[in-house]
């Protein structure tokens, strides 16, 4: 077996011929190419906005296995040539370029593939969090697409926010996550709805929350506003997915027939009311038909005059408020229509708070 002087010295074992020409049968002379990969890294670095990095080496499995076997045979404890290469290249980058190595959460990972002497770049996504307000009805939260028909509505909240952030951070794509969703014809007011955006492969990490908020408002024609925007991390997204915050709604109703006496006192009886809801008929085409148990925390009368009633309802996450009002042909029980023995029409629905 022929070894380069470096590997022969690392192994402290003299039964191998020293390599004079060609490739080392152990490390493939990868350490002789540190300067070459430094130049490649420097060229890639000009394309991205980052401050931290990590070097990786994808070495052939047989080389690493052979290295372990030789180390055991020679009786020495050594650091792998893979680690030596990563340290050598990383140290040169830190010494000559304005970047620092980060072993926990680097913004760029530069990985050399020893088998084909090529390299790859991984760019850490950027995560943003905030709350959005929807000020115009008719905007869906996610793209509204029907098979064979394409988009049937204007752009969605996820597009207004995600495309804007993606453009300003020069990303390749985005993912949008929110804490629940409001109906397409409902407004999202009050303190807004929590959301996160993941920006993939960002070439710009200069975070300007005021600029993003301004551009979202302009892009949506005033229909979507972003507040409390800040940087986040993926752990926070996973935490948000497990939370089930209560929601507070304002519902405008038209009630037919005679006035209801003592309505406020009647509604107090329904605090912490447990209801059973089957999947609403209006979404059966996209959601599985199943039974859910939910809680109406409280109901208050905000206004009641001339057959027009405005209620403020606080409910458990996942409650279908419209169906609680109308009963959805018996698919939600108990429901307000049957409990008050009224004919009712929903005029509007607003979300006031997402805790």
Protein language model regions, located:
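Non-catalytic RNA-recognition surface used by pseudouridine synthases
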Residues: 1-355
